[in-house]
């Protein structure tokens, strides 16, 4: 069942509008009639909505080193009926070259901080992504209806706003799935300790087999210069602090409980820059080079900066730091 205040996807059916007919409309590229739009808008994200992103073992390893959620994702409620690795393969964003053992699937779960962080990938919002040629993309095409391609299911999909990294909420988790549909929490995110705590016991070691050294570590700390570049910042009594998201609560990031004051304002701070006229978010830096991610991917921008598709919807390239223009830290304020 959805959480308090959550709205399930609403599909009005009748003799004239069967499930099969609605499903066909959701799978018709660029179809944006009023019926499909109304159905899609019924699947709204609210503060605290449980989100999910299906991962490969390569992506799990990345998150354990500091990656943040970006690109395509789903409301957990909309995909709760998919329980086995075979079923969850539909939602994967990684390339087939990173295929894992077929009897294992992984996913990242977190809670939405604010609806402002998510977009519906329609032709109006992301025209280049919808029109991306097959040779330039990984995974299934973006239909533009707001639903993921599927021959059996009607599943609303989302992208993070501008394809930017989003700060993880407290108690985010990485879970594993077995062929019989069992689910195990493998790791939980500890924001005050800046790391992941392994939760899986000996009976789940098979799920961890492809994750390298994570099998033997109880705690995996994150480096201060981690891959993610979006930060959650808040103010308390006029001073600015890094902030922990624990919807509906937001507090100062502090090791001691006594210092975890509730913040009075809240924003997501993300780094942006332009290169060769292309607007990007800054993902990481290494010496005189900066890793950029396209905010509005299209085929011309991909060619212009030599971007590579790393997962469905995510296009990144390395650029000389000296050639970047329009650098800025952009704050997205959230209402409290």
State what each model feature region is.
Residues 3, 8-336:
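Short, surface-exposed polybasic-aromatic patches that bind anionic ligands, especially phosphate groups
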């Amino acid at each position: 069942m959805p959480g308090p205040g959550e709205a399930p996807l609403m599909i009005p059916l009748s003799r004239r509008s069967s499930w099969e007919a609605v499903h066909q409309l959701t799978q018709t590229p660029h179809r944006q009639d009023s019926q499909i739009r109304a159905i899609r808008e019924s699947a709204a994200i609210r503060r605290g909505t449980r989100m999910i992103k299906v991962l490969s073992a390569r992506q799990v390893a990345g998150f354990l080193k500091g990656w943040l959620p970006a690109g395509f994702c789903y409301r957990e409620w909309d995909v709760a009926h998919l329980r086995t690795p075979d079923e969850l393969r539909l939602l994967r964003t990684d390339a087939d070259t990173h295929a894992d053992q077929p009897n294992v699937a992984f996913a990242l779960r977190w809670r939405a901080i604010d609806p402002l962080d998510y977009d519906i990938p329609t032709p109006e919002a992301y025209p280049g992504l919808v029109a991306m040629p097959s040779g330039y993309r990984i995974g299934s095409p973006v239909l533009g209806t707001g639903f993921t391609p599927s021959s059996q299911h009607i599943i609303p999909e989302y992208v993070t706003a501008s394809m930017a990294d989003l700060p993880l909420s407290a108690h985010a988790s990485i879970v594993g799935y077995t062929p019989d549909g069992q689910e195990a929490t493998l790791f939980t995110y500890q924001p005050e300790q800046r790391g992941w705590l392994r939760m899986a016991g000996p009976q789940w070691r098979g799920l961890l087999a492809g994750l390298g050294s994570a099998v033997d570590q109880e705690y995996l700390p994150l480096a201060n210069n981690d891959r993610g570049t979006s930060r959650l910042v808040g103010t308390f009594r006029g001073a600015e602090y890094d902030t922990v998201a624990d919807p509906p609560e937001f507090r100062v990031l502090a090791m001691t409980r006594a210092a975890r004051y509730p913040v009075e304002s809240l924003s997501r701070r993300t780094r942006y820059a332009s290169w060769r006229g292309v607007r990007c978010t800054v993902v990481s830096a290494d010496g005189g080079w900066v890793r950029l991610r396209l905010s509005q991917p299209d085929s011309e921008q991909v060619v212009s900066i030599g971007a590579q598709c790393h997962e469905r919807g995510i296009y990144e390239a390395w650029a000389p730091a000296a050639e970047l223009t329009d650098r800025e830290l952009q704050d997205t304020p959230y209402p409290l």
